[in-house]
Amino acid sequence: MKRRSFINQNSFGLAGALISPKIFEYSKIIDTSRITQNTIPFVLSTWNVPESTQIAADALEKGVSALDASVLGVAYEEKNLKNNSVGNGGAPDRDGNVTLDACVMNHNGNCGAVMAVENIMHVAALAQDVMEKTPHVILAGEGAKKFAIEQGFTPEDLLTESSKKAWKEWLKKGDYHPEINVENHDTIGMLCIDKQGNLSGACTTSGLAYKMHGRVGDSPIIGSGLYIDNNVGGAVATGLGEEVIKTVGSFLIVELMRQGRSPQEACEEAINRILKKHEGKPDFQVGYLATNKKGDIGAYSVVSGFSYTHNKNKINQNTNSNSVY
């Protein structure tokens, strides 16, 4: 009989203090006989999120799968009230509703996504449930919320007082234009490689602040906000989703790596594909982050200000990406 072990909730330390109990359902039974030490666990995330990458890295060290670790890692930012572009406290749409989007993709190419979900904080976890517990890939709106409640997620008001105050200030003018690198964070996209050498990822966001109600960007769209091919590598996107969708950016990057491009070369080409459709310096930001199966990293953005966090050998490092402008 193969040895199996449970990952104890308390073993995640800081995560245990800040993330709801529902999240710890990701610490599933681990088949320890399949765990090897040949691959050093690897975590890569958009923006400066050292707590999230450390939580994911700690989980990987304990044998958690790359998918479970990435969902657990981004859950920290979904709970983090200081991040107003993800989860609880996320900026609302123009009607004052916080609507969340997320997707996940594992090493087998299986994926799940949720769009325009209200009152459910941990939407990356919900996307994983869509992947694992339904015959579908995407659930949206009230249907996704209903499914979440059936799975044990607790509905809650995600509009914080600070987000509400900012929204009311915006209402006085009503001007709508995406802010570049607002507070130096945006969509949280995370890529993990586990001890078995498998690559998976998760992507979560509250979308553009003061968007039209029902707007969905790239984050929950497989191939745009996130794409994984376990034989090649993975990529995630951040920034103005409409521009990412038009070139199916994350899929493009992985396909370029399949053709022999390095992660850096692939990210640069994906940004250039966007810029070819615009004259001069654009007034929006898009950033891409990618890795191949060897752990080589690529990152590139339209304008400066995009950064990423890398955790390897238990060390976090935040790096500013190169950019066109």
Question: Which residues does each predicted region cover?
Answer:
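Alpha/propeptide regions of enzymes that mature by internal proteolysis
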Residues: 11, 29-325
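Hydrophobic h-region of N-terminal signal peptides that target proteins for export
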Residues: 16-22
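Binding-site signature for planar aromatic cofactors or substrates
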Residues: 23, 27-28
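Solvent-exposed, well-ordered amphipathic alpha-helical segments
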Residues: 4-5, 21, 75
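N-terminal secretory signal peptides and thylakoid transit peptides that target proteins
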Residues: 1-15
